[in-house]
């Protein structure tokens, strides 16, 4: 079992910022199309984080042209170039699935008060 832990530790990313559910993040994805490589950004609210070793994921939700878009990203994926923390949100839940049913201003997350 120690061999498996060593292999998993080699693939963990240590450059990710500390973020929680409710935070607004910008994920920079590395996309390879043929021989070309480009960076695509996805900005939205983190509605779920599943931590773990190499199998951890986080879900980001944004509204694009009035349509809600959710995307699940592996935490330790080599295709993620970087994750930027834009704002920290103040929420009382870890799973923010209720945002799917809210529209407009009601779907906003209050910013965290920093004193």
UniProtKB/Swiss-Prot annotation:
SUPFAM superfamilies, A to Z: Translation proteins SH3-like domain (SSF50104)
PROSITE patterns in the cross-refs: RIBOSOMAL_L19
Record keyword Ribosomal protein present: yes
Matching InterPro entries: Ribosomal_bL19, Ribosomal_bL19_CS, Ribosomal_bL19_sf, Translation_prot_SH3-like_sf
GO biological process, one term: translation
Keyword check for NADP: no
Matching Gene3D superfamilies: 2.30.30.790
Entry GO terms, CC: cytosolic large ribosomal subunit
PANTHER family the record matches: LARGE RIBOSOMAL SUBUNIT PROTEIN BL19M, RIBOSOMAL PROTEIN L19
Function of the protein: This protein is located at the 30S-50S ribosomal subunit interface and may play a role in the structure and function of the aminoacyl-tRNA binding site.
Similarity comment text for this entry: Belongs to the bacterial ribosomal protein bL19 family.
Protein name as annotated: Large ribosomal subunit protein bL19
């Amino acid at each position: 079992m120690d061999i498996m832990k060593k292999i998993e530790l080699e693939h963990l990313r240590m450059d990710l910022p500390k973020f929680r559910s409710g935070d607004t993040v910008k994920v920079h994805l590395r996309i390879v199309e043929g021989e070309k490589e480009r960076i695509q950004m996805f900005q939205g609210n983190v509605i779920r984080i599943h931590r773990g070793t190499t199998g951890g994921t986080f879900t980001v939700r944004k509204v694009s042209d009035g349509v809600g878009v959710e995307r699940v990203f592996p935490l330790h994926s080599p295709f993620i170039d970087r994750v930027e923390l834009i704002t920290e949100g103040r929420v009382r839940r870890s799973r923010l699935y209720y945002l799917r049913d809210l529209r407009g201003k009601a779907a906003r997350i209050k910013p965290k008060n920093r004193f």
